[in-house]
Amino acid sequence: MIRSALRNFSTMASFNPTSCSPFTRAVVNSMKKLYPEYLADKSFDNNGLLLESPFNFAERQKNSVLLTIDLTRAVADEAIERGDSIIIAYHPIIFRGLKSLTLNNSQQDSLLRLAQNGISVYSPHTAVDAVPGGMADWLLDMVTGPELTPGSALPHTRSTIHPEQNPPPGFENAGMGRIATLEQPGRLASVVNKLIANLDKPNGIPVALPQGKEIIDMPDIRTIATCPGSGSSILMNNGKPVADVLVTGEMSHHDALAAIENGAAVISLFHSNSERGYLRAVMRQKLVEALRDEWDAVRTQEAAGVGGDIGMIDWLSDSNFTVSVSERDQDPYDIRTIRVDTFST
């Protein structure tokens, strides 16, 4: 169908490329539909298209996307080696204003090399936190199961801690943070074990408990709140915890103290460990499904400017693409145990 449309346009003017590759544009359009930029916390966030690399058809990249939490030098190398068109980096690599772009700074070096290789960068960041079915819901699902799933291990109701005041259609439950109210009290030990299993952290996870308490001493959990990344501003309200158990990536020392002084438990997963699994578990498939229709639409739209360029016709006739999760993206922290007797004096 696309090839037929392109042939019909073959007598028109020569192709006038968009500023970035048509495939990159389709990916960005898809991400905006899945995770509306409007929902991001603009009080501090810098989400959106952060690096738009010009499209050169003769040196075009593959129609492929690489998903990552952090755009490190290792991930940039991975994308260049793979020949991806665009990186979806959850955390914005450009967060504050840049006064220069030099090779002396590792992040700027990555941006320059990506631009040189025709690879764009898009960051959805807190829009992913806010959407229904986003990271906050994903974290809560690990413990409770989805709210409306029959036979859920922990029957519950859930709500948004900070609801979006004017959500776009289809995103009525959007906002920051989620809180579940259990129909029957649960055990903290069960919450911890489920997170360890679902996040594949056999060495354990950090847990802050009220002084004098052990995990097995907290069998009457009624409410569980989640916030990916840094959760203090969402999970604490005027110095008080919003739930019996707070699950987040990290919480400041003083906020954790305030939480446990008020009887809550804090489960800190390390910042990006509360986010990374979402890419493979949820985002990848969502983007694949959205991109199928969007890439068809963009290819048809681009047909109008192709002219008689057979190479461009063949390229735009190909509906195939790939969406992959980075193999080199990882949290900077890990839990290690070292036996004292392995050291020689």
Feature roles, as predicted:
Residues I2-T345:
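Active-site catalytic microenvironments in core metabolic enzymes, especially phosphate/sugar-handling
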